Regions:
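Beta-lactam-recognizing serine transpeptidase/beta-lactamase-like catalytic domain environment
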Residues: 1-33, 38-216
Length: 216
């Protein structure tokens, strides 16, 4: 343990704050490959990619003057979109992001609620740190497409992905379902309204299908 004797009140308070900090809400991070689900849903919704579209991965993707590598430096070779998702192939998702373009990518980023806080019933939720749209070139778009060069909270990503696979209805995470008395009787059931529709149900079903292939 830590001896609090002789510690300033400010230091004590700082340590208490750190102890109660919830990184899922209070901290942002680069989501990485988990964010490919967002690019997938946007690409399918906009019709710029379909399940059997053909891709080729030589181990990198050239974007402007940059060679952006796949995690598999030897490359995945020829694959369709579903296989590209199974392989978590960076060049495939870069290509989908570039097909969407910056304007459309931002449109879906906002549509999927990623610029908003989730509204979870806990304090201190942090916001998304994203490129300004006007400063976003093809290289930035490429890196965002597979979850790098920007930051979001884990709870924001989890809420959005849940919404994209539940039929397309935006959810707000909550902790309580009911208030109960000490003997277990329900005093009050907590009801929450449904969120807005952020993705077509058929597209949501397709996203779910692809993700099932990834883990099978």
């Amino acid at each position: 343990g830590m001896d609090a004797e002789g510690m300033s009140e400010e230091k004590k308070q700082d340590l208490l704050n750190q102890m109660w900090r919830n990184p899922c809400l209070n901290d942002t991070y680069e989501p990485g490959s988990t964010f490919k689900i967002i690019t997938m849903a946007a690409g399918l919704a906009e019709g710029v990619v379909s399940l059997n579209d053909s891709f080729y991965c030589p181990g990198y993707k050239l974007v402007e003057d940059r060679r952006i590598h796949c995690a598999n430096r030897r490359g995945h070779g020829a694959q369709n979109f579903v296989k590209g998702a199974e392989n978590s192939c960076n060049p495939v998702f870069i290509e989908v992001g570039l097909r969407l373009g910056t304007d459309k990518y931002y449109q879906y980023f906002r549509q999927f609620g990623l610029m908003e806080k989730t509204g979870i019933d806990l304090p201190g939720e942090a916001g998304t740190i994203m490129h300004q749209e006007e400063n976003m070139g093809e290289v930035e778009l490429a890196t965002v497409s597979f979850g790098q060069s920007f930051q979001i909270t884990p709870i924001r990503l989890a809420a959005t992905v849940s919404s994209l696979i539940n039929g397309g209805t935006q959810i707000t995470p909550h902790f309580g379902v009911a208030i109960e008395s000490s003997d277990g009787e329900t005093v009050k059931a907590l009801e929450y309204s449904n969120g807005r529709k952020i993705l077509d149900g058929k597209i949501s079903e397709t996203v779910r299908y692809i993700l099932e292939q990834v883990v099978e």
